[in-house]
Amino acid sequence: STIALRTMCYSDLISYPWFAPAGIPNGLVTGVSRIGYLRGELGTATEFVDAPLTDGDRIQFALSKINAIPFIDGSGYVIFSQTTSAAVDSELASINIDRGVKYIKRGIRKNSKVFLFKPNDQRTRDQFKAFVDAFLSELVTLRCLFDFATLCDDSNNTSERVAKKELWCDVAIQPITAVEFIYVPITVKKPS
């Protein structure tokens, strides 16, 4: 929806693409005063019906992979989930992880062009690995990744791949997930 796109742009403006565009303040929805639906037939007079979300609606939305936009007292309408259509057990089921992975792929692809047509030897592989490591290290600092590992040597750049004029760099990442639930168990003890 245009609401979600505008909210993602706002979230990127105040943080990074790998921060969840949900919650307060990243998920604040602007320009919306009511949420509901139109009742009536197209081409005839219609009526706007307010449809505030109930807790049951939010549960159903979550099960259907629809991100809820409830009204939060003191803040207004807020996108309050960040589900994608990916499989539930996938890390890519969260918008912030999916966008972080896309940012990484684009950043490496965009900046790797300087390595094209260089000699396909270990020195070039070492330089390429150093570039990828530096890029990913910055993303650790910027709270996109917990950790990463890269491999760019003879084990994944076999003689067959070199003969096909290919350079391979395997990357494994451990992205930082967003807090979606907070639990605060409180224990009351009798005075001693």
Feature-to-residue mapping (PLM):
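Structured, hydrophobic secondary-structure cores that serve as assembly/anchoring elements
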Residues: 1-192
